[in-house]
Amino acid sequence: MRVLVAETGREDNVSVHSREVSVNGSDSGTGNDAYKLETDDEHPPATPVRGLSTRSQKRPFRPLTIQQDEDVENDTGMNTEYNDDNSSLVNTPRDSTTYAETNSPNTEKLAGRDDDRSLLNLIDRGEIDSKRQRHYVPVHCKRMPKKEITLNQKLYVSQVIGPADAPKSKTIFGKRIMQWEPSQFKESVWASEISKSGKYLATAGKDAIIRVWKVIETPERRETLLKEGPQSCGRFFTPSSIFEPEPVLECVGHNAEVLSISWSKNDFLLTSSADRTVRLWHPKSTKSLAVFRHNEIVTCVAFHPIDDRYFVSGSLDCKIQLWSILRHKILHWTELEYVVSTICFYPDGESIVVGMFYGLCAIYETKNLQYVSSWLIHHSPSRNKKCRVTGLQCASIIPNDSKSDNVVLVSTNDNAIRLYNTVTHALVLKLSDAHRVNGRVLSRLSEDNSYIISGSDTNEVVLWHIPNKVLINASRKRSVILHLPTETFKVCSERLTSTIIAPARTAVEAKESEHDRSLIAEGYNLVKPHSHRSYGTPPVHPIDIIIATNMAGMTIVLCVDYDLGNSHHGFRNSKFGHFVKRLLRT
């Protein structure tokens, strides 16, 4: 291409027609997750010439014209058309192309972003050797104490499981972009859960198929998978991968999207679906063990944490029902004021917490579903009208202490995370505005209450650190925590649908498959250690494995390498850190 600049003294209004980005589709499905670039030729929005201010456009300037050889397209991949006065340029796309969701809400910057450098795109293009190198994910820290262990330079991609078909690459506007077709979003994951034993991971979503992935059991099995090569190891497999590359079970039976998953303490699995049924599964059986039919779409389901012969379900007909699995019938049911969106049990199973539309949370006794209490998320009725509770998780303030007060982590669609005391209904913690939390991604507490994990509107995983005794002190003093130490990182360009901090049992199972069982020390410390510099501790930490799923149906497994950079935050800037640098130079 040759660019010619012509000298002129007349005031021509040279404008480059901007590309419009329109979002096609509704909130459900793939409409919000595939952007379409179109050019309006009839009414192009004129924008100022690049490099010229509003004042400078009144003065004479040299208009920019582009001369192009015949049958040659410009660098932008667009066909070039000229107006009659040859003063303005119209870029018309050769075809309408669909792309993955952008990182920023400002989708007009899609053409200028280097999307082809995202993690999953590098894997699809084979730029990461899974056997020779670890791909460490950049982690951004905020408000981190100096002595706090961070994930920076420690978090790496262990495994990617999901659809076998890779996205197609295409050069648009001078950028190489990995292209996802709408048909490739048929396997979007809506729910994911790790079993209580830590051996299984279940994912389900749009295609109505429940996939169960098993932790690799023995070192011999791991070596066999590495020798077989990438053809049998799925999308991305490394020597430190956690799960089998292929699901050990694919449960087929639902006729519509699966909305919720719940594991029992004995590795039984319940799934609720838009086909108005709840089905019971087990990893060793390909067929559903039982089907529980409802009158409306079942939005949520939860196993009893102590006695897995019972479970509760919530549906769009504003009802919650307590079921007996052995009797295959409803023991108790009650009709609520609003539509039920999510439900969870107390750790002891004595009560349940129900999340509803219009920002309402309520507590009921499990035994007979008697009403106990309720509270609203907002004080303003107009704000509650738009608020919907999307996720609940109940936990004890002091882990494994039956006498401790309970707190419930509430996820809503107003981009905030809240933690309430279930007795006083007092707000203990509220996290919002900083990272624009995506309310569709269920926020979760780690099993030792050391972390809260969620996803943001910019497709980042957000991890909040909860210092020791902060929740206890805040609950006693009735104070509200608004800020916590935060770490954020990005693993994909598609919208996240769920994030999980794997329990310590999953890390133990993975360690046993990497090494001999005799190397695993007894008495694992499952709570956050008070001292981070303890060299005799077993190889299990408060956070070892993070799992994220996205709209493309992929499950990304990340591990933390605590052996690399075994120092606390701020080590490089400390006096001892400078001393070590000088010592290494000599």
From Swiss-Prot:
Query: What keywords are annotated for this sequence in UniProt?
Result: Cytoplasm, Nucleus, Repeat, WD repeat
Highest taxon in the source lineage: Eukaryota
Q: Which SUPFAM superfamilies match?
A: WD40 repeat-like
Biological process terms in GO annotation: vesicle-mediated transport
Identify the stretch(es) annotated as Disordered: 1-115
Q: State the WD repeat positions.
A: 184-223, 253-291, 293-333, 335-374, 387-430, 432-474
Localization of this protein:
Cytoplasm; Nucleus
**Cited Pfam families:** WD40
Which stretches does UniProt call biased (Polar residues)?
21-31, 76-107
Task: Read off the PANTHER family from this record.
Answer: WD REPEAT DOMAIN 44 (PTHR14221), WDR44 FAMILY WD REPEAT PROTEIN (PTHR14221:SF65)
- For this entry, the protein name equals Uncharacterized WD repeat-containing protein C18H10.05
Protein's organism: Schizosaccharomyces pombe (strain 972 / ATCC 24843) (Fission yeast)
